[in-house]
């Protein structure tokens, strides 16, 4: 089997945690790697962003990333990329003709890629599986007041994909309900495929490893640490954590606590300086350390150094950061939204918070920070919980889904593009 994956707006090889690179990038590369191990040939098509990028990057046996030139390498925001969908589609067609490569199935990721996949599906007459990862209607329902709403144009494009893709692959039952509620999706064309985590890389280590992680980050061994990992944008909620930490210090100015915020700028509404200034205004700038995004091999040290990882997102289709943290032996406090109640076993591997009130978050943080016995037990249970999720299992589900889609292939090129 040969699969064309499409990730038009962001390369799976890009560093997660900055720009448009995040959990989706991890998902695509991790599942493609595992599918390739099963003998499935996977080409991931993405838009070239540097002239120095080779057109074909061989990642592993059976796995390639294809960089397609479409528009200028730099200077285009994600919001401007719809102007390059035709160029990107044309680039894919030119590449496949020149290389004489054909595919059995298309798997598109995110709505921009889905629009490309929809057209190619009809041209090539092969099945299209689409994974949205995020949805405009859901983001607009949960967004923070400081965040820019998603456009009606995006919602329309998503509706077209819901109506025309052969299979809609979702991360959780919650996401399935969102598709049905907001987009009137046919439940018979929706399949739940649970994401995973790299439980070999993200592991708790031992006391010596934790001490080494703290030394590398310049954190005293006996200081409590709360970490945030993710893109610095309002939708991910770093402002919620900063305000909650300020509330904690208002209650107890002598609290022995440090906060790590690890991530880079993303989108038009915030930069690291935005959150540094917020911390200064709230008087907690000396308690918070900002770190640039780190590759997975270094990110595990951040998870291990933390006593708690906070995930105050306004929505997550699953929550890979929560799963990686738990695999590393660290309990999680997360918002009760999207797929996070599945990623975090409430009361066993962490806590879930209703809403985004800084005081509610301060209460949750204090509950675990001040109860060493419960926090340590949750960290131990978190490791076992995370081990029930793996990328190999995710890929096995996808492989089965692919085979079913090919077996049930009924693509006649008659879909409505109006």
UniProtKB/Swiss-Prot annotation:
Keyword Magnesium: yes
EC number: 2.4.1.250
Protein's GO biological process: mycothiol biosynthetic process
Class of this enzyme: transferase
Molecular functions per Gene Ontology: acetylglucosaminyltransferase activity; D-inositol-3-phosphate glycosyltransferase activity; magnesium ion binding
Binding residues for UDP-N-acetyl-alpha-D-glucosamine: 15-16, 23, 231, 236, 294, 316, 324
Positions bound to 1D-myo-inositol 3-phosphate: 9, 20-25, 78, 110, 134, 154
Keyword terms: Glycosyltransferase, Magnesium, Metal-binding, Transferase
Annotated residues for binding of Mg(2+): 303-304, 306, 330
Catalytic activity entry: 1D-myo-inositol 3-phosphate + UDP-N-acetyl-alpha-D-glucosamine = 1D-myo-inositol 2-acetamido-2-deoxy-alpha-D-glucopyranoside 3-phosphate + UDP + H(+)
Record-linked HAMAP family: MshA
Protein family per UniProt: Belongs to the glycosyltransferase group 1 family. MshA subfamily.
Subunit (UniProt): Homodimer.
NCBIfam families: mycothiol_MshA
Function comment: Catalyzes the transfer of a N-acetyl-glucosamine moiety to 1D-myo-inositol 3-phosphate to produce 1D-myo-inositol 2-acetamido-2-deoxy-glucopyranoside 3-phosphate in the mycothiol biosynthesis pathway.
Protein name per the record: D-inositol 3-phosphate glycosyltransferase
Taxonomic source organism: Corynebacterium glutamicum (strain ATCC 13032 / DSM 20300 / JCM 1318 / BCRC 11384 / CCUG 27702 / LMG 3730 / NBRC 12168 / NCIMB 10025 / NRRL B-2784 / 534)
